[in-house]
């Protein structure tokens, strides 16, 4: 190294530490004056380090999500028909309204049933509802609601029904390639710029489609392009895994939700719960499942016992007992939450059923065999 070259610490030859701090505070103040308070901050000085959440209405799903739907984020819920997508969002709306919040429902499918919503606890008198004519209109309404900072949750049902104006004004059979994807991409850029400041949770419901010609891997995909997949902080895949019956009469379904993406908590968790026709998510059923896993309620054969006493034969009868004894159910819930806070592992807060993406990709690839003995 030449004799005249010296190594110095960054900034030591320019200004002292005190001068640098003064200059930094000056520029931070200038940025806040120009762009508003909170436009830049030290992460340790943030008033809300922990992301606030909205309950999903199902204790098992709250556990899988790390508390519920995150406030000020985009959430996507997708799955096949009649799997419980709308029911999930109506429960979230009911939870927001219970806390005194304001909720909006953008009904692009024009299929909202106010009687069913009311049966789930939604205050339909104060629910903001829009039935837009075009996708542009729907997303512009969402953007204005988010910008207002006066709405706590906005639900869009669904992305597949957000039809671009060019498609509506055209004739049947006209092809407009990528119009909906471009619309969603532009909308997500606008909405996410303000959603964090407003604290509004935006939930998009989406439908599944099949990719043509896929021989390896999952042929399913969601509508509206890839923008929503990137901008969403949480993506939930909900499936109907069982039909609940009493004799020959169907009274509900068993739903499984996979947390396909989560930016605010560990992803790839799985939650199961019952959805009862006309009543929505069985909160008592979720509580019983967790009580059994944590050992608060013990099952021996067909009988369930609590504190050594049999409380019901079979799951359905035990749920009825808990509904008829709300004080005991409250005590059980307190004990369950205490166990969970102590770190007790249950199915909903551990990653068990999903393979790592790399392993799935490896199994999806065709195997090439070489040599004369390959067929053997």
From Swiss-Prot:
This is Protein RecA. GO terms for molecular function: ATP binding; ATP hydrolysis activity; ATP-dependent DNA damage sensor activity; damaged DNA binding; single-stranded DNA binding. SUPFAM superfamilies: P-loop containing nucleoside triphosphate hydrolases (SSF52540), RecA protein, C-terminal domain (SSF54752). Can catalyze the hydrolysis of ATP in the presence of single-stranded DNA, the ATP-dependent uptake of single-stranded DNA by duplex DNA, and the ATP-dependent hybridization of homologous single-stranded DNAs. It interacts with LexA causing its activation and leading to its autocatalytic cleavage. Belongs to the RecA family. GO terms for cellular component: cytosol. ATP binds at residues 79-86. It is found in: Cytoplasm. Keywords: ATP-binding, Cytoplasm, DNA damage, DNA recombination, DNA repair, DNA-binding, Nucleotide-binding, SOS response. GO terms for biological process: DNA recombination; DNA repair; SOS response. Residues 357-376 are annotated as: Disordered.
